[in-house]
Amino acid sequence: MKKYLLPVLVLCLGYYYSTNEEFRPEMLQGKKVIVTGASKGIGREMAYHLSKMGAHVVLTARSEEGLQKVVSRCLELGAASAHYIAGTMEDMAFAERFVVEAGKLLGGLDMLILNHITQTTMSLFHDDIHSVRRSMEVNFLSYVVLSTAALPMLKQSNGSIAIISSMAGKMTQPLIASYSASKFALDGFFSTIRKEHLMTKVNVSITLCVLGFIDTETALKETSGIILSQAAPKEECALEIIKGTVLRKDEVYYDKSSWTPLLLGNPGRRIMEFLSLRSYNRDLFVSN
């Protein structure tokens, strides 16, 4: 085990002390970005931040009226260009088609921000299998479809993917079983794909964004009278997601508590993943 000690220490230090590179707004100047779930909440705020930084944006959500308003505001804020394509991520054919159409509008892709979710109601789980299926399809499977469709463009640009997840995807909480299951699935799938990118030398970063209780209109409405803690601001949350994605971090934590990254970051898991990766014949996967 002694031969693993130094690599493990380096891993731990790397986890707790993120990259020294500082974020600069000009890093987004002219970048081509897709944002899903962009008609309101965190998605809308990300679109506004990106626009102020001079990015090209293509937005999607179910509400065409909401998207029209956001795109108009994006152009006012200084977006290099702003377009929208309305549709539902319950339709996997639309999800795949959306990426193709967005790529044509942008002329490529530098960053894919996956932020949409299906409607979630806080309640005890009894026998609503339909709710579980819908959550897994919209909150998880559509993310797989979108990222798979976008990967060829992202490989060309050495781009980035942001996966908007939740503390409910790192720890169990009552009343949101279906939602939590879909968020755990995001971690399992995309953290695995990140390892595969490392093994096969694919220079596309994947940033898992682990969010706490954020003051979006939807979250405040659904949790009214149930969650007693104070929500964190969506504007700052959106900016932290963008920063972490641009800096190609593996994970971004945003919550009112500064203890969240330490308690949920799970360095033990990272050590085990690092050690297990050493047992693979990487040359086999690179050649395939």
From Swiss-Prot:
Record bears the keyword Transit peptide: no
Pfam families noted in UniProt: adh_short
UniProt EC number: 1.1.1.146, 1.1.1.201
Record: glycosylation sites: N158, N203
Tissue: Liver, kidney, lung and testis. Brain. Expressed in liver (at protein level).
Cytoplasmic topological domain residue ranges: 1-4
PTM field: Glycosylated.
Entry's transmembrane regions: 5-20
Cell location: Endoplasmic reticulum membrane
SUPFAM superfamilies: NAD(P)-binding Rossmann-fold domains (SSF51735)
GO annotation, biological process: cellular response to estradiol stimulus; glucocorticoid biosynthetic process; glucocorticoid catabolic process; lung development; mineralocorticoid metabolic process; regulation of pentose-phosphate shunt; response to nutrient levels; steroid catabolic process
Positions bound to NADP(+): 37-63, 88-89, 115-117, 179-183, 212-218
InterPro entries, alphabetized: 11-beta-HSD (IPR051253), NAD(P)-bd_dom_sf (IPR036291), Sc_DH/Rdtase_CS (IPR020904), SDR_fam (IPR002347)
Membrane topology label: Single-pass type II membrane protein
Residue ranges annotated as Lumenal topological domain: 21-288
Family: Belongs to the short-chain dehydrogenases/reductases (SDR) family.
Protein name, entry field: 11-beta-hydroxysteroid dehydrogenase 1
